[in-house]
């Protein structure tokens, strides 16, 4: 259930914006996810985010923890993740992942606020 040996280089090139690598990385991710690994390697979610498939990345992330939450949350959502935080699917992600409930008790991060409808809206 591990990623194949070519994954690190392909994923790194994808994260750096290589369009050709992105196509290969997405195909590799599709194959990897078809095997239903548990837990999912966190880099897979990050690659989906950087490949523009934010809804799919958030859906995977909200269903179960990855093997590396700090990578996905730190680098994916908070560091350079404005397009992820502002995606329409982000509010559902915060609810289903438990972040919204945690923020209700502890307060949201600086980039987020609770909207009138109860959803968290982030910049």
What are the roles of these predicted feature ranges?
Residues 1-123:
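Alpha-helical protein-protein interaction modules
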């Amino acid at each position: 259930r591990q990623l194949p040996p070519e994954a690190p280089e392909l994923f790194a090139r994808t994260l750096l914006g290589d369009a050709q690598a992105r196509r290969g990385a997405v195909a590799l991710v599709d194959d990897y996810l078809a095997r239903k690994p548990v837990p999912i390697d966190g880099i897979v979610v990050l690659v989906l985010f950087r490949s523009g498939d934010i809804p799919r990345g958030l859906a995977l992330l909200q269903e179960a923890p990855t093997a590396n939450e700090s990578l996905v949350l730190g680098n994916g959502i908070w560091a350079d993740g404005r397009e992820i935080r502002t995606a329409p699917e982000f509010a559902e992600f915060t609810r289903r992942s438990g972040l919204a409930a945690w923020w209700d008790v502890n307060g949201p991060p600086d980039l987020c606020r609770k909207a009138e409808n109860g959803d968290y809206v982030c910049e």
